């Protein structure tokens, strides 16, 4: 059995979106890579905050459940059609940047942040997002398993994958590997 200290406390899901954070009197924009009830992973930060705790607003996409949707309905969808919610809380950077020069900070690509005292509404929004993404990922994996030689099934698979943020042009084995990796990352290290 694996060491419980190495297990994640929360499920996490990819979130390719944006976040705004405040440092002093300035607002900065960053990319979000993944999200869990415990925190999120940011990239493309134009500025490493001077303080450890900062207010943040996250653009959270509201995916529908794709299972049971007809191919024509899925093909009509675009991520622009999905509702979005702006959720706000405070985060603490998990990694310390003390004793690093400003030049060293320029080369930092990712920053993990944990949520600091999120309110129940925020927690519910994150939980719902992660749970729904997980269900859609399981559905997408089931499409791989039942693929066979049916053209409609491949179209449905590629359409759902695209809506979840994957490149629909990838070769099927590579696409499956990426989806499987994200599925495995949902709950374990």
Regions found by a protein language model. Give the residues of each.
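Structured alpha-helical
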Residues: 1-189
């Amino acid at each position: 059995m694996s060491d419980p200290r190495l297990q994640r406390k929360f499920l996490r899901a990819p979130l390719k979106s944006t976040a705004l954070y405040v440092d002093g009197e300035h607002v900065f924009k960053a990319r979000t890579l993944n999200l869990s009830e415990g925190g999120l992973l940011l990239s493309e930060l134009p500025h490493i905050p001077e303080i450890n705790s900062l207010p943040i607003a996250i653009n959270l996409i509201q995916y529908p459940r794709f299972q049971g949707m007809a191919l024509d309905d899925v093909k009509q969808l675009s991520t622009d059609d999905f509702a979005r919610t702006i959720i706000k809380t405070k985060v603490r950077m998990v990694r310390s940047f003390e004793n690093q020069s400003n030049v060293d900070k320029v080369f930092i690509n990712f920053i993990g942040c944990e949520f600091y005292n999120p309110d129940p509404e925020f927690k519910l929004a994150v939980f719902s997002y992660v749970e729904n993404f997980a269900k859609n990922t399981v559905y997408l994996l089931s499409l791989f398993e039942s693929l066979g030689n049916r053209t409609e099934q491949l179209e449905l698979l590629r359409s759902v994958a695209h809506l979840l943020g994957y490149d629909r042009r990838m070769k099927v084995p590579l696409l499956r590997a990426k989806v499987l990796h994200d599925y495995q990352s949902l709950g374990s290290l």
